[in-house]
A protein has these predicted regions:
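Acidic/His-rich segments in extracytoplasmic proteins that coordinate ligands and/or metal ions
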Residues: 1-48, 134-153
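Loop/turn elements at helix/coil->beta-strand transitions in domains of secreted/extracellular proteins
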Residues: 3-6, 26-31, 51, 82-88, ...
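Second-shell loop/turn segments in exported
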Residues: 6-10, 32-38, 49-62, 94-101, ...
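Soluble non-cytosolic domains of exported or imported proteins
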Residues: 13-17, 38-45, 59-62, 66, ...
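Extracytoplasmic/secreted envelope proteins and their assembly/folding machinery
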Residues: 17-20, 45-52, 61-65, 69-72, ...
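Structured C-terminal subdomain patch of bacterial secreted/periplasmic proteins
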Residues: 38-56, 60-62, 67, 145-187
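Basic- and aromatic-lined ligand-binding clefts that recognize polyanionic substrates
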Residues: 60-114
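His/Asp/Glu-enriched short active-site or ligand-binding loop at hydrolase and phosphoryl-transfer sites
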Residues: 107-127, 147, 177-180
Length: 187
């Protein structure tokens, strides 16, 4: 039988998805982690300090965060004078709709800080914007890179989901990247 000291969860604001009311009702201690609402990449990383506090590891978290900030700023400086940024788009379609990160999202900020030209930087907001597949194909067909495609282990898996993915130049050139390093050493 489990008897946790604390359960960390997130809250969406939608009763059908949130588990914390039931957990609290069951007498369990709950803390809400809202890191996913943070649009600044370093702000998201700083939530590690919040988690560290529950383990009395604040000093270690502060040190790691400070090192991360320094590395991040160094990386930004490396591309700050880039004259021809690469073009990039993100994500994949889900049930026929492509949820593209808004131009103020942490994904858009990460790409800009990396010296990339995010094809959808003009989308309003920090959340994902629903787009038709055809709209994405029209705007991103010639993009240099495609990131954040999910937990794919091989490129051909994308085409197995939707053959239209093969129409993207990034797919044809093999410049498609997942966010999961757990799959291969290169991500």
């Amino acid at each position: 039988e489990l008897n946790p000291d604390l359960i960390m969860t997130s809250a969406s604001g939608f009763a059908e998805y949130d588990s914390h009311p039931q957990l609290l009702e069951a007498g369990l201690s709950v803390v809400i982690n809202s890191d996913y609402l943070e649009y600044d990449p370093l702000g998201r990383a700083e939530w590690g300090k919040f988690i560290a506090a529950f383990f009395d590891k604040e000093a270690e978290a502060d040190k790691l965060f400070d090192e991360m900030v320094a590395r991040y700023e160094e990386a930004k400086a490396l591309v700050s004078n880039q004259t021809e940024p690469v073009t990039v788009f993100a994500n994949t379609a889900y049930e026929g709709t492509w949820y593209m990160p808004g131009g103020e999202s942490y994904i858009a900020i990460l790409l800009a800080d990396a010296g990339a030209d995010y094809v959808f930087k003009d989308l309003e907001g920090s959340g994902a914007q629903p787009l038709d597949f055809e709209v994405v194909l029209e705007r991103a067909k010639d993009a240099d890179f495609w990131v954040n495609v999910g937990a794919m282990t091989e490129l051909k898996e994308l085409a197995g989901i939707d053959a239209r993915y093969e129409d993207f130049e990034a797919y044809q050139q093999g410049k498609v990247y997942t966010y999961s390093k757990r799959i291969t050493a290169a991500g």
